[in-house]
């Protein structure tokens, strides 16, 4: 019985690895994602850690998935395109608005020196912290609060990314951006 279970687990792991590789091949062949650092981060972070268990088999499907509180984890292509546009460097400090389940913050954690992410739903902030711990990411701080206010205490930030839909950029976020920084919404 234990051998069958182990074989099933290994089969699922191989399937997910193949799904990841298929997405990376698609992004490379289409020249959609050209940053090797971002592609490497995608391969390193297990997206299945950040989705509900019932959706683990869809972790690498290129569409959003529900994460609770009527929120979703963005589809992988959207996440990767935003990260590429953000042009994060290893020495950067990044502020993310909209932590969700923590997946984007985990990728940012591999790309940047330090990440602060703000989530308005306390339950999702707790989930993001747990998911980041599970993924072994230690340079990301998850705050629960109003992302429109940013995080003045730890500013300025080299990069600010708003992962939720926003009609306009709140002034506090602009004020917390470092000189020559990039703010993406």
Give the residues covered by each predicted segment:
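Class I SAM-dependent transferase core
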Residues: 2-95, 103-106, 111, 124-127, ...
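Conserved nucleotide-cofactor-binding alpha/beta core module
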Residues: 87-185
